[in-house]
Amino acid sequence: MIVLSLFDGISCGQIAFERLGITFDGVNNVYIASEIKKNAIKTTQLHYPNTIQVGDVCKLHYDSATNALYKDCVFKDNKYYLGEKVIDGKPDIIIGGSPCQNFSSLRATNGLAIDGLRGDKSKLFYEYLRLLKEIEPKYFLLENVKVKKQDKKMLDNYLDVEGILIDSKLLTYQTRARYYWTNIPNVTVPEDKHISFQDYKDTNIERCKESSPNRTPSRITMWANGNGGDNKTCKNITHADKVGCLSTKQDRAPNSGMIQYGDWCRYLTRREMEQAQTLPIGYCDHLSYRQACDVIGDGWTVDVIKHIFNFIPWEEMKCQK
């Protein structure tokens, strides 16, 4: 089985496959990752060294004439000039979460327009769509934020399936509503596991210290003695059951929430962020706190992806468990 993961990040998709008993040795089962962020690639290769990294999605091309996938291709004069061959044959499954900055409601919070599919970042969706049409895999999965109604309709039409809205809070303590477009049959919304942040709150002194920022005027405003600032964009989650949606930066407003720490506050620790995304504990211990925030916030909630993959008719797939 060949899986092509576009905008792979830290390989949350690969973790989900692993939890279903499917591992990638690079021979029988092959996992190809398109990613350009160095810390994300570093994390993936640390945990999954058999992953084939292919770089920029814009330079990937499946050539039907040779029945092979190529990287570092050049598109010129309305055709592709082939680069280095990655693998013979075509992927059985394509997965990915194209960058969502232009869809995100955070743009409106920061006074920016929600550009949808017209935005520079979200235009990478069309690269996903291009490869989907070139390869025509058996199954595909696309994840994105909760988009506007008109953008949702456009994406439904482009992908010829209706996106399913699943909130990560059903399977973890993080509120993270996302749309998932897939042709995997009969996917349903998972049942609520009623998981509370209070059962996972980190008490490790070093990790809590690491996530407690220095006092500055802007951070004092964000915390506002636990009142979350004037516009309540930084919620006090000290006693909350759920935390806000993880983003790539905790040190900003809005964020996932702030926690009372002594006479001051802290952000989520790296352990709390990992568990909010149902990542393996310690998955990002090799990174700095800020680097961990970046790649974890960019990632998927693994157990949501596992839930979706569980509906794949595995008896039809050429994979080894």
Where are each of the predicted segments found?
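Short, hydrophobic/glycine-enriched beta-strand segments
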Residues: M1-G9, A33-S34, I93-G97, C245-S247
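Catalytic phosphate/metal-binding cores of nucleic-acid and nucleotide-processing enzymes, i.e., regions
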Residues: L124, Y128, Q277, Y289-C293, ...
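Class I S-adenosyl-L-methionine
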Residues: M1, L6-I15, E35, D63-I93, S98-Y267, ...
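SAM cofactor-binding core of SAM-dependent methyltransferases
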Residues: V3-H61
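Short, well-ordered alpha-helices that flank and scaffold nucleotide-derived cofactor binding pockets
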Residues: I15-R19, L46, R130-K133, H307-N310, ...
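Active-site beta-strand/loop signature of hydrolases that rely on acidic residues for catalysis
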Residues: G9, A33-E35, D56, Y128, ...
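FAD-binding beta-loop-beta segment adjacent to the flavin cofactor pocket
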Residues: Q260-H286
